[in-house]
Amino acid sequence: MAIATNNSRVYASLQLKNKQDSMYLAIGKTTPWTNEDAPPAPDPTTTTLTEVIGYKKVARVSLCREYLPSDDSKYPVVSYGSRKFTLIPDEDGYKEQAWMVYVEAEITGDELPTGTFRQVGIHTDLVSKASSEKKALLPTDVTDAGILQFFENRQQQNRTSDVILKEKFIITMENKKSVKQ
């Protein structure tokens, strides 16, 4: 079996990162899971979230890699769970072997309908109706949801108008590996 080279992983990460203009966080699944304490494993054949509540334009996308102590003076560093990652500029992607992508989005108050949700995902190539410049979109504002690139099933989360939801993702281009928080 052939393997992907490190440079091909950086290339794939750059391709994804360059979709930022059409990249949106999606939240959905308002109805309960069969077992609320144990959401089902995500199905890789899924093409859209269940019961989409809305979409929010991502705020930040960057190449990244595992943190090294020497990074503090060279590049920005972000925390993801209990781990640190270094944000790498595109021009240094190959040199730094940055084959991960950091994605950050924020939903503030009631810019999308409030209430419970159980799924989050990242869409690329989303097309809004009438070239809308809005950053928060309802499903009715969307002509084409594009490609659901990544998603996660979760236990119930509740958003109220007083809550700021900040979602961060580290997407790795390595096969059969995911980054745990």
Curated annotation (Swiss-Prot):
The keyword Cell membrane does not apply. Its main location: virion. InterPro entries: Gp8_sf. One of its GO terms (cellular component) is virus tail, baseplate. It is found in: Virion. Keywords: Viral baseplate protein, Viral tail protein, Virion. The keyword Cytoplasm does not apply. Gene3D superfamilies: baseplate structural protein gp8, domain 1. Belongs to the tevenvirinae baseplate structural protein gp8 family. Putative baseplate protein. This is Virion protein 3.
